[in-house]
Structure formats: C-alpha cells, structure tokens
Amino acid sequence: KLIESNAKRLNIPVTIFESDIFESVFNVEKSPCYLCARMRRGHLYSKAKELGCNKIALGHHYDDVIETILMGMLYGAQMQTMMPKLHSTNFEGMELIRPLYLIREDDIKAWRDANELKFIQCACRFTDTCSSCAEDGQSKSKRLEVKKLIAELKKTNPFVEGNIFKSVENVNLSTIV
C-alpha cells in the first residue's frame, strides 16, 4: 500500500506484483543478498517484458555504489562496481538503468521528506534497517558495517567517498597483478 500511496501522490502509474523471492532465500546462509538481488532482477525483467517494456530502473544511488566497491574489495576479494546502465545478458533486448547513480543518499532522504513520502525498507532479515542485529545488538549487515567505516574515514579525509567512487575509473593496469 505504501508504494501505491507514494505513486498516487506523485501521479505515477505503478504495477505491483507478488513473488516468493524472500521465502526462497530466507534460509540461504551463503550470499543470500546476492541470490535475492539476482532473483528480484530476473522477476523485474520478466514482468517488464510481459508489460512490453525494454528497461528496468533500480534505485541504487551514489552511496550504494561506493559501499558496493568497498564490499567487493573487503569481503569478496575483487574489484567491482555498479554500472549506471547495463544490457541484460539473460533477457534479450532488456536494459537496466540506475537513474539515481550520482545522487547522494542524504539528498534522496531530503527530497522524500520535502514531498512527505514514506519509503519501505527491505523485508529481508539481512538488511541494515530490519532484523539483522545479533544478540549483542551489533548489526550483521556488511553494508552497514561499510557505511560506518566510510563515516570514520571521512573524519580524516573529507574526499574519501569521491576517491572510492573514482578509484574504479582510474585503474592503473600496469600495477595490477
């Protein structure tokens, strides 16, 4: 209902559909977030094709991008990023776009508040805003952990976020193993 209410307030047509993704990944211990994201994207591509669309738009923003870069390095032992636009390899003729790619999370929250909107949080137990806390009150969310690390780094380097973002564009291949 919250999504429908926001869409109505902004005069945006919306199509809501159900899936069993959360139940499918709930008991997966290794990489449930990755699996869930892949499954959600697959469902979105399928529904978009069914509706005659050739693109899906995701709400990832600048802060998501820099957190993903660090998460890949620190927890996945790889250099990776989110791209603002992708051509699907599994759904012919489909594209994924991230229109908020360069928008800061705080700016999105300010816009939300100025427009008196309410955002839903992920219904998953692994996210930083839901039931992802251990018994000692510490979050098990790697994204929240990285978000806190970035906040600490900003205390001594105000350019750290921009540097992380640019790091995947400024790769010196002659120094890579």
Regions found by a protein language model. Name each.
Residues 1-79, 83, 106-114:
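ATP-dependent adenylation/nucleotidyltransferase module used to activate substrates
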Residues 4, 13-14, 70-73, 138-144, ...:
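Domain-wide signal for the mature, well-folded portions of proteins, strongly enriched
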Residues 16-17, 58, 121-124, 129, ...:
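Residue-level detector of family-conserved "landmark" positions at structurally sensitive sites
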Residues 36, 138, 156:
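Catalytic cores of large soluble enzymes that bind and process phosphate-bearing ligands
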Residues 39, 141, 159:
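Conserved active-site and cofactor/substrate-binding residues in soluble primary-metabolism enzymes
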Residues 39-40, 86-93, 169-177:
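AMP-forming adenylation/ATP pyrophosphatase catalytic core
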Residues 63-145, 149-150:
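Catalytic subdomain that performs nucleotidyl-dependent activation
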Residues 145-172:
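An accessory alpha-helical subdomain
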